[in-house]
Regions:
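Conserved PLP-anchoring active-site segment centered on the Schiff-base-forming lysine
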Residues: 124-151
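Active-site PLP attachment segment
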Residues: 241-275
Length: 421
């Protein structure tokens, strides 16, 4: 009997080899130094359009100084769970600040936004008993997702049977959601959607969706990872939609985008958050945000609240960048948010475009299947606050040379993102 190597028996070797040959997997690139508007990879300098920490706080001298001072006071880690030791002071401060900003009673922080999403789904579909008297059972809940919700939400709900306990409505389509809610009847329902979607920059019809949730007595959960501290001010786009945000029962935020650090949080009424500490599992049973990170995040939030011009100026530059790409005839997403997606099309072309931009000194994120539908590959661009006008123009010209002549002067109206249904 021939002995088959373990890797072959499980299929990992064949999976990796075939994925590499088809361009789905590549050898990891070594990044040296900090991630910012410029980046060094394998010893070579690049203008970086791949980062999500677009305001550059992790390079800000004042933030770095404050972080180091917090390290001296609180150490590098909590050293234990909040259940056994108590809530670390920086976490308490951060949670109170987020609650105040979002207009909610209480907030629970997590080590990442993904853990917040995983914990939420786990808590809302859980059966748990402390004793015969003290328990909860929500296994009969039905979750209704926008079909373009983040992978972490779909992954968290993978234990639910699609079509029964897990349903999906067409992206940003309130009419389709209404149809589903009508069919759900009086079952306990939770509608899950995002404020701003990361691949195509689309913004949800927040008010219309929450109107339906209230009408059908469904709970609402907004993943505000990409909208937190960005929209909601009168002088900014989408002000009307974001005025409805705090009507949601639950708001999840990420600290890796506008705040530029790591961590996530869920804000809601106190009874939900008190229960989530136990039921989520991803807060109490795993590591928390580092105390100095929580401290620095709170300071950044306060600065963004006090100095609105920081975000105002950034959003204006993002719109100017978007218009520059439109003027080149590039096919980009419809929604004028700070996330700009440039359509490439065929998956086979996507890797060629990435390699050509790489050779010109640009680091860009290419989204291809399975991140999007087959042959709807795109470049997801987020301008960095510290990109220079020269860098932006040089990059726009490179895109024009590569894609401008092959794309009609129209916007991306039919982009349909793949889901994990």
């Amino acid at each position: 009997m021939d002995i088959v190597p373990k890797a072959d028996r499980w299929g990992f070797q064949d999976f990796v080899e075939s994925s590499v040959s088809e361009g789905f997997l590549r050898e990891p690139v070594l990044m040296q130094g900090m991630s910012g508007s410029r980046i060094t990879r394998n010893g070579l300098p690049y203008v970086n359009f791949s980062g999500i920490n677009y305001l550059g706080w992790q390079q800000d001298p004042q933030v770095l100084d404050a972080f180091c001072e917090s390290v001296k006071r609180y150490g590098l880690s909590t050293g234990g769970s909040r259940a056994t030791q108590g809530v670390c002071e920086p976490h308490f401060r951060l949670e109170a600040l987020i609650s105040e900003h979002l207009g909610k009673e209480k907030t629970l922080t997590f080590a990442s936004g993904m853990l917040a999403n995983l914990g939420f789904i786990n808590a809302m579909t859980a059966k748990f008993n402390f004793s015969p008297r003290s328990g909860i059972d929500n296994r009969d809940a039905v979750l209704i997702f926008d079909r373009d919700c983040h992978w972490s939400l779909w992954k968290a709900a993978s234990h639910l049977k699609y079509g029964e306990s897990l349903l999906a409505f067409k992206h940003n389509d309130a009419a389709d959601l209404e149809r589903i809610l009508n069919n759900v009847g009086d079952r306990k329902a939770i509608v899950v959607f995002e404020s701003v979607y990361s691949s195509d920059g689309s913004v949800a019809p927040i008010g219309a969706i929450l109107d339906l949730c209230e009408r059908f007595q469904a709970l609402s959960y907004i993943d505000d990872a990409n909208g937190f501290m960005v929209y909601g001010e009168p002088q900014r786009n989408f002000y009307e939609e974001f005025q409805h945000l705090n009507r949601a029962d639950f708001i999840m935020i990420s600290l890796s985008k506008s705040i530029g650090l790591e961590g996530g949080a869920i804000s809601a009424n106190a009874e939900y958050i008190d229960a989530f500490e136990v039921l989520s599992g991803t807060s109490i049973f795993t590591a928390a945000i580092q105390p100095p990170t929580a401290d620095a995040a709170a300071s950044i939030i306060e600065q963004l609240k006090q100095e609105s011009s920081i975000m105002d100026d950034y959003l204006k530059r993002s719109l100017t960048f978007r218009q520059r790409l439109l003027d080149s005839g590039l096919q980009i997403n419809d929604t004028p948010s700070y996330i700009t997606s440039v359509l490439i099309g065929k998956d086979s072309k996507a890797e060629q475009v990435r390699e050509q931009l790489d050779a010109q000194g640009f680091c860009v994120p290419i989204f291809r299947y399975p991140a999007v539908k087959p042959n709807q590959a795109l470049i997801r661009l987020i301008l960095h606050r510290h990109h220079t006008d020269v860098e932006i123009e040089r990059f726009a010209q490179s895109l024009d040379d590569l894609l401008g002549s092959n794309n009609a002067r129209s916007r991306l109206g039919e982009l349909q993102l793949a889901t994990a249904q």
